[in-house]
Amino acid sequence: MVEIYYDDDASLDVLADRKVAVIGYGSQGHAHALNLRDSGVDVRVGLPADSRSRARAEEEGLRVLTPAEASAEADIIMLLTPDTTHRTIYAESIAPHLTAGKALAFGHGFNIRYGLIEPPAGVDVFMVAPKGPGHLVRRVFEEGKGVPVLVAVEADASGNALAVALAYAKGIGGTRAGALRTTFTEETETDLFGEQAVLCGGASALVQAGFETLVEAGYTPEVAYFECLHELKLIVDLMYEGGISQMRYSISDTAEYGDVTRGPRVITPAVKAEMRKILDEIRDGAFAREWVAEDDNGRPNFTKLVAEGKQHPIEQVGAKLRPMMSWIA
């Protein structure tokens, strides 16, 4: 069973004499910085001089420096920019100031898991990864609650890395809900698999295939859109709130019977075998190597595939129908 830590298991006193730098001010960066600040932590934000986020961070009362300046000052450096920017930011702005006794932290394990960043000996390396978007992390913190987080320690040079990670998690509100102990490897591999096989890749491909099947059979594209894309949120919300069984309890008997008898015909053993291949590519590093090479080469295939996706008929149909929906238009 997973170890779960709560407020009583963490102490902000661990951070009392430490300076924290949050590098980045996007979805997670702004939530981490503001929550830490409101928890009494000495925090500064690291942003390039030309970053459009500097004004926003300053308006919200935060001290803003360049990533290099923030890293030089800080005892704990949390890197919360997109994965593909980490290597450059680390090499240019963090590594020169990452001396023994400091800690390097992440919100996702990708660059450590695949060896793209190799911190020096004498440095703690940990992860605090909220299981929710930054705006939710900030909002529930202000409500006196928290979003669950994953906590991992990759390097414990000080012998106190877990306590520091838990203190950080408490500072952003994570231990109010619960901090689940994991590893960089587990977090990275499961996160990538979920994105590729289920949440993003799997879901979008399933929706498009269902839409295409109905339209090719002669059904109206607008009705196909409602049945295969629009109503997906209704079902996902039920699953989100109470699990698959609660969703099945909430739908009609006809829908439930179709679920349990036809669903396995869609997700067949062959589909699961392909899922295992995707997982193998994640575990052996093939996906990471492919993505890093694609990014380093200017993203030609990525750009092409995204552009092609935008031309799918379901996008045009959705653009026509969504203005009818006052709650989202």
From Swiss-Prot:
Residues 183-328 form the KARI C-terminal knotted domain. Mg(2+) 2 binds at D191, E227, E231. Residues 2-182 form the KARI N-terminal Rossmann domain. One of its GO terms (molecular function) is NADP binding. Binds 2 magnesium ions per subunit. PROSITE patterns: KARI_C, KARI_N. SUPFAM superfamilies: 6-phosphogluconate dehydrogenase C-terminal domain-like, NAD(P)-binding Rossmann-fold domains. Mg(2+) 1 binds at D191, E195. Its cofactor is Mg(2+). InterPro entries: 6-PGluconate_DH-like_C_sf, KARI, KARI_C, KARI_N, KARI_prok, NAD(P)-bd_dom_sf. Keywords: Amino-acid biosynthesis, Branched-chain amino acid biosynthesis, Magnesium, Metal-binding, NADP, Oxidoreductase. Substrate binds at S252. The active site is at H108. The keyword Repeat does not apply. NADP(+) binds at Y25, G26, S27, Q28, S51, S53, G134. Transmembrane segments: none annotated. GO terms for biological process: isoleucine biosynthetic process; L-valine biosynthetic process. Belongs to the ketol-acid reductoisomerase family. Involved in the biosynthesis of branched-chain amino acids (BCAA). Catalyzes an alkyl-migration followed by a ketol-acid reduction of (S)-2-acetolactate (S2AL) to yield (R)-2,3-dihydroxy-isovalerate. In the isomerase reaction, S2AL is rearranged via a Mg-dependent methyl migration to produce 3-hydroxy-3-methyl-2-ketobutyrate (HMKB). In the reductase reaction, this 2-ketoacid undergoes a metal-dependent reduction by NADPH to yield (R)-2,3-dihydroxy-isovalerate. This is Ketol-acid reductoisomerase (NADP(+)). It comes from Frankia casuarinae (strain DSM 45818 / CECT 9043 / HFP020203 / CcI3).
